Structures are given as structure tokens and as C-alpha cells.
Amino acid sequence: YYLGPDFDEVAVRAAMDEAGVEDWAEARHVKDIHSVIADALAGGAIVARVSGRMEFGARALGNRSILADPANPLVTHEINQRIKNRDFWMPFAPVMMRARAGDYLANPKELPSPYMMLAFEANGRHEEFIAAIHPADRTARAQLLEPGQNLGLEAILGHFGTATGRHVLLNTSYNLHGSPIASGPREALDTFRRSGLRCLALDSWWLRKKDGTQP
């Protein structure tokens, strides 16, 4: 799943110093970054998460991702227009634990989908993740997370589910349209600075742009 480059705390601090983060964002090192992310998502924030080894493959699977609450249909416009700068009609995908798939998707064969490569029809609870399904036919190209596949993302889903009663998130790659996915801390901070994102979880660092900061 995660065979790409990794980074350490030294690289994070060096990248933040180089980017002059203190001038345009508030940054704090937190012990339980996963609960901080989940609380922000439950409060309506859109959060970029950069942690651990990068994904190797066609999809962002949580370590170089933008996450949001898919129950809010307005996040589709927000991410497309203000963050990723891409066409309005381009859909997003959901991520959930595989054990929760039956709550949201029609998957009679109980197929695994750890790489976000299979499409499923949404079931009657589609309003709970309306921003992460295709609006034309209510299908979803879902990432069904296996236990232990990504402990951090699993923890975020767990905290978010406890806070909201919904056990699904919107997951899309952390990049601007036409640019590669952010790899390490330098790219993560550059993308953060140039996008309309307000929140970034960079390993165990929580960054929020200061009021008035423009991309």
C-alpha cells in the first residue's frame, strides 16, 4: 500500500523553517493528531493529511490526502474551486472501514477494495456521504480500509464516527490540479500555501493558516 518515500521530524522542522511558516500559519506539535483531525472534520473543516510513507499507485489512500465530511454537499465546490482548482463536475471518493461498507454501499459479494479501484452503488444512506458519490448515478469509487492497513486513518475514522455517528469520509489526493501529489514536507507546505486550504496535518504537526492569509 505505502511503498513511497518517508520523512522524519527533522525534515518537517527544516521545511517549516524554509517556508517561513510562522509568518502565515499557526503551527503546534500535538500528541494525538488523529483526534485533532477528526474533531476538525466533524466541525466542518477540510483537512490535508501528510503522514508516513507515501502511497505507491494510482490513488491517494490517506497518507497524502485531503479529507472532508462528505455529508456536506458544499465541500465538493469548496475543494474543486478553492483548493484543487479543477473542473466543478469532477467527483470525489469515500473512504470507510471495510466492515462498515454494508452501511453505505451495495456490495453483495463483499469484495475488497483497499486501493479505491472498484465502483459500488450507494445504498439508502447516500445522504451521509453525498459529496463523495457520483451525482449522475449515485455510485462511489470507494476505498474500503482493512484493519491495520493505515492505523492513523483508521483512528481518524473511528474518532469521526464517535463524534458524528457517520463512519465515512471524503478522500481525495493532496495536490493542485495538474500537479503531482505532494510527496514530502516541502511539497506539502508549498501546496498548502498555494491552495485555499486552511488546515494541514503534517505528521504530528497541526497547521492552521492565519486570518487574512491568501493562496
Language-model segments: which ranges?
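Flexible beta->alpha loop and helix N-cap segments adjacent to enzyme active/binding sites
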Residues: 1-215
